[in-house]
């Protein structure tokens, strides 16, 4: 078959090699123009055609990520068009117990909580997120490599005798997970130059061989794509007014209600949805009640996600995340307002990006920030930190970076 593959940044090169191994005539296109030249030469040495724009001609199959607009095809005749997720579904061979998590917000947090809860219950866990990939240990996530969370990288997960592999996925999934989760669809944003919606890509995560878990309020929407859904939500409720730097008391419904005091080193109320999802996953796997409760008590948050620090005599909130947007910023500010913590606050927004695809909407972010009455400074992304006035008692840093 003549196979055309678009996008060499999000794993198209991996799929190209799989098709080549099957004897296909493969053309791979660097549509974003940022694939390293060394990688292109490596593929050419394997007799894979590499181009910077789509060559004209007729193809039997075209493989492209859902976020690529069809206009990239130009005058080519694509034949059957399949997404990266659908192609991964065809090729993936990993038989280890796998949990895949996609969604708009909270993916990394949910994956960290799931990994910790499973590890604390005695399981060996590999964690693959936008922060990196590696085993979960008694000290937390041991990151051994930085790697994309695009669907094709599910085919290159680290080897090892793990009881569970927990994977964050950007858009879609393999369709073959043992447990597939969608955190939420708080914004069904446009992709592929607004020719598709994010939900059209994320729905590819639904598995035909395991359990599918979605937010309870979103069951009516997702049921058009998957009939056998497990709803999550409502297992964790705040029982005391949150205060900055103090762990809130929460009531956890997991085989009966229990009161738990969360750690105060991170904004725990930002994590309530992720906690709900992690508890639902663990309940479906039969993780003991006391084990998950202790995991919640000892969880310290994801590094760089709602961290509460003390620097230069002031408190600092640090959000380092590829998913920084007006929605995530609004959520952080709302949590801080609930703590009466915004007096004397200032925001630094750093748009530095390390292989991050989602662009920030400056106007939307400014409107959200203005609604909370907090001054904001936007950096040039050059690593130069702006001067912080001495009367600022709380510095909130939003840094958009990570691996997608």
Which sequence ranges carry the predicted segments?
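Adenine nucleotide phosphate-binding catalytic loops in nucleotide-utilizing enzymes
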Residues: 6, 196, 230-329
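ATP-dependent carboxylate-amine ligase
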Residues: 1-35, 284-287, 294-302, 308-404
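Flexible active-site lid/hinge loop adjacent to a nucleotide/diphosphate
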Residues: 147-223
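Walker A (P-loop) phosphate-binding motif
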Residues: 86-132
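Short, charged/polar "capping" segments at the starts of alpha-helices
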Residues: 33-40, 68-74, 135, 219-225, ...
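Conserved substrate/cofactor phosphate-moiety recognition/catalytic segment
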Residues: 34, 125-155
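Active-site regions of enzymes building and remodeling cell-envelope glycoconjugates
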Residues: 24-25, 38-52, 59-62, 75-83, ...
């Amino acid at each position: 078959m003549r196979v055309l593959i678009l996008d060499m940044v999000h794993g198209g090169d991996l799929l190209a090699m799989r098709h080549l191994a099957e004897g296909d005539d493969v053309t791979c296109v660097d549509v974003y123009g940022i694939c390293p030249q060394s990688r292109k030469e490596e593929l050419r040495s394997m007799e894979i055609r590499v181009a910077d724009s789509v060559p004209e001609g007729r193809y039997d199959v075209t493989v492209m990520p859902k976020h690529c607009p069809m206009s990239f095809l130009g005058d080519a005749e694509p034949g059957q068009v399949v997404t990266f997720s659908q192609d991964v579904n065809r090729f993936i061979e990993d038989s280890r117990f796998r949990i895949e998590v996609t969604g708009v917000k909270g993916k990394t947090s949910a994956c960290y909580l799931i990994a910790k809860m499973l590890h604390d219950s005695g399981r060996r866990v590999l964690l693959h997120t936008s922060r990196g990939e590696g085993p979960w240990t008694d000290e937390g996530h041991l990151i051994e490599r930085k790697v994309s969370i695009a669907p094709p990288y599910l085919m290159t997960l680290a080897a090892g005798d793990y009881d569970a592999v927990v994977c964050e996925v950007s858009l879609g999934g393999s369709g073959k997970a043992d447990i597939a989760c969608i955190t939420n669809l708080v914004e069904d944003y446009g992709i592929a130059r607004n020719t598709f919606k994010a939900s059209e890509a994320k729905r590819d995560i639904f598995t035909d061989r395991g359990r599918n878990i979605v937010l309870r309020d979103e069951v009516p929407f997702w049921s058009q794509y998957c009939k056998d859904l497990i709803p999550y939500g409502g297992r964790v409720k705040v029982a005391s007014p949150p205060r900055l730097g103090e762990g809130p008391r929460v009531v956890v419904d997991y085989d009966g209600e229990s009161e738990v005091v969360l750690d105060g080193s991170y904004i725990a109320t930002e994590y309530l949805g992720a906690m709900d999802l992690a508890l639902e996953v663990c309940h479906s796997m039969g993780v003991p009640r006391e084990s998950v409760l202790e995991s919640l008590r000892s969880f310290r948050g994801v590094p760089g996600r709602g961290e509460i620090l003390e620097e230069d005599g002031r408190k600092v909130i640090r959000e380092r995340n590829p998913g920084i947007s007006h929605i995530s910023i609004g959520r952080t500010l709302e949590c801080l307002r609930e703590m009466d913590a915004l007096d004397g606050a200032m925001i630094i927004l750093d748009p530095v990006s390390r292989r991050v695809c989602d662009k920030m909407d400056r106007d939307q972010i400014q409107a959200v920030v203005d609604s909370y009455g907090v001054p904001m400074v936007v950096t040039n992304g050059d690593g130069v930190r702006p001067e912080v006035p001495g009367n600022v008692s709380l510095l909130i840093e939003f840094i958009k970076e990570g691996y997608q």
